[in-house]
């Protein structure tokens, strides 16, 4: 059943800044409500089928029933969100995001780790279980709207060897890293969108698979030098930079500089008394500068000469 009807959102406040989720906020023992909060606010779990309910179960991979699971070592706080599909239960889990960057998002850079916590070779040792990744720009829940599957982000059972039983999804032998940049999007400022993982019910017995270390980075590929992403007033005095960034601010602000690959290359704190940041050590090229100035998140592209 649906975990929540409030549909909290994960706010994305700056381009090229990654949102990350490690699922360690999941319970590490017993059963818990699928209404997620705290560090998992904005995420939802949906079970369908005759055995669906409003709880998920903590497991080391020993559980065999169709269910949604918080996987991890016994009593460990290092968790992963997963499931076992069956003929009477299917599980979806995902999140709603809101574009609060002040600019159109046309790309989403996605990565996560697929983990194998239980393996059952009864269906055959050549058939892989699967979790699909999908996104929707018009959904209002995990089941509404039009969804697009991303083949490059499909997770399949990592290791098909051995006898039936528990696997250690934290072991490299049972983990698969997946990443892809979704292009051609048109997510306007203020718009929401959803992502979800869907556990596929394969023919025969299913494995216990999970997702961990999820990352989503909003991007805009069309910004030119000097484009203001958010704020009617230009917060940078200079967008053609030699050695120093000069800001307009009335108070303290945290400043971050990213290269065109989305990597953080410089961070600093500025104030009205010292509103300059030394970037002399950065190579020539384009960068994106983000900051929280006077309570508003702003971002702008610069050229380092």
Model-derived features with residue positions:
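A short beta-strand element within beta-rich, extracytoplasmic domains
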Residues: 106-119
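Extracellular carbohydrate-recognition regions
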Residues: 10-60
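Short strand-edge motifs at loop-to-beta-strand transitions and within beta-strands
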Residues: 93, 178-180, 273-277
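C-terminal outer-membrane/trafficking sorting elements
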Residues: 227-305
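Surface-exposed, low-complexity/disordered Ser/Thr/Gly/Pro/Asn-rich loops and linkers
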Residues: 41-103, 209
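Bacterial Sec-dependent N-terminal signal peptides
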Residues: 1-12
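Short coil-to-beta strand junction motifs in C2/discoidin
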Residues: 122-132
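Terminal, low-complexity interaction segments
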Residues: 10, 88-89, 102, 114-115, ...
């Amino acid at each position: 059943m649906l975990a929540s009807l409030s549909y909290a959102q994960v706010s994305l406040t700056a381009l090229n800044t990654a949102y990350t989720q490690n699922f360690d906020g999941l319970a590490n023992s017993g059963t818990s409500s699928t209404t997620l909060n705290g560090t998992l606010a904005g995420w939802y779990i949906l079970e369908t089928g005759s055995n669906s309910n409003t709880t998920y179960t903590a497991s080391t991979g020993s559980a065999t029933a169709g269910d949604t699971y918080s996987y991890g070592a016994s009593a460990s706080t290092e968790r992963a969100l997963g499931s076992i599909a069956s003929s009477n239960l299917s599980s979806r889990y995902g999140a709603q995001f809101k574009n609060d960057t002040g600019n159109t998002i046309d790309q989403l850079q996605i990565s996560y780790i697929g983990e194998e916590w239980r393996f059952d070779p009864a269906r055959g040792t050549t058939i892989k279980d699967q979790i699909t990744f999908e996104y929707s720009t018009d959904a209002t829940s995990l089941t509404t709207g039009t969804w697009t599957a991303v083949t490059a982000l499909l997770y399949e059972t990592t290791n098909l060897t051995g006898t039936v039983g528990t696997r250690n999804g934290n072991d490299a032998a049972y983990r698969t890293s997946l990443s892809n940049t979704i292009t051609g999007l048109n997510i306007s400022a203020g718009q929401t969108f959803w992502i979800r993982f869907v556990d596929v019910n394969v023919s025969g017995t299913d494995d216990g698979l999970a997702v961990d270390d999820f990352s989503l980075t909003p991007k805009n590929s069309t910004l030119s030098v000097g484009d203001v992403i958010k704020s009617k007033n230009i917060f940078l005095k200079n967008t053609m930079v030699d050695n120093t960034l000069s800001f307009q601010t009335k108070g303290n602000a945290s400043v971050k500089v990213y290269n065109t690959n989305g990597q953080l290359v410089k961070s600093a704190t500025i104030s009205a008394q010292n509103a300059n940041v030394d970037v002399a050590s950065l190579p020539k090229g384009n960068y994106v500068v983000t900051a929280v100035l006077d309570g508003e998140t702003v971002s702008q592209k610069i050229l380092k000469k």
